[in-house]
Structure formats: structure tokens, C-alpha cells
Amino acid sequence: MENYAKGNVLRVHCYKHNGKIHRTWDKTTVLDETDDYLVCGNNKVKITESTKRTHRTKETAIVFFYKRRWFHVTAQFKTNGLFYKVDIASPFLYDEGVIKYIDYDLDVKIFPDGSFRVLDKNEYKYHRKLMKYPDKL
């Protein structure tokens, strides 16, 4: 059963296309939900990488996880302005308190002045062949 009530604390699991866990967030708080997306917020949360290395996010962030779109958007509140990161990813699934999605490597970082940079192009090219990403990506 889905439990997206405002204020609920969930976890986040990010997978790769081959089904292996890529990273996890220990918590995120539900801020809102619509028919299209789930909005969550976090601040200095613990992230565990697939290598078991852990670190904490440096700033407050709000994430829009989409139910039917192949990306999600993170707004990062940094000391030098508001940054956005758009991650190419599967629509999320909810499973017993965990938001789950597949990461497809490509990201777009948008700076406070509106400029942007596409990130991880080489990682995408490599994983696309290795993991046989669908052509529609």
C-alpha cells in the first residue's frame, strides 16, 4: 500500500539497469503528492554508495520524483544560489517505505544563472552498451 502522506519519512534506493543497487539515501520526507509526481525534501542525509562508501549531502534539497516520466528533478539550495539537477531515470516505484528507480547516468546540472552542463556522457555511453539500454533512451 502506498503511503505518501505529508511528513512521512521514506528511504530511496537507486538501481542500475542491470538490477544492481547503485546508491541509497537513508531518509527523505514527503512534502507533497500529485497524480504526476511525489515531492520529497531532505537535508544532510546519509548516502551509501554501491562500494559501501558513505557520505552526507551538503545542503537542503527538494526532489520531484515522477510517476510516469523518465527523469526526476532535484533543487539544491546552496550558499551561492539555487541549482537544479535533472537525472535521466525510470519512473519511480514505491515498495514498503522505499522509493525505487533506475538511474540511466545522464544528468543535466542547471546553474543559478540559467547556464547548464550535461554530466556523465561517457558513463552513459559505456553503460548503454554494457547493460543494453533500450533504444528509446
Summary of predicted features, one role per range:
Residues 1-58:
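Charge-rich, low-complexity N-terminal segments
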Residues 33-35, 77-80, 110-115:
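Short acidic-glycine loop/turn motifs at beta-strand connectors
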Residues 38-41, 80-88, 115-122:
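Short, well-ordered strand-loop elements centered on a beta-strand within folded domains, enriched
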Residues 45-48, 92, 124-125:
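Short, surface-exposed beta-strand-loop junctions and turns on beta-sheet-rich folds
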Residues 49-54, 96-97, 127-131:
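A short, polar/proline- and glycine-enriched secondary-structure boundary/capping micro-motif
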Residues 52-93, 106:
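Phosphate/ribose-recognition catalytic cores of enzymes acting on nucleotide-derived substrates
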Residues 98-102:
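Short loop/turn motifs at secondary-structure junctions and domain boundaries
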Residues 104-137:
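A hydrophobic, small-residue-rich beta->alpha segment in the mid-to-C-terminal subdomain
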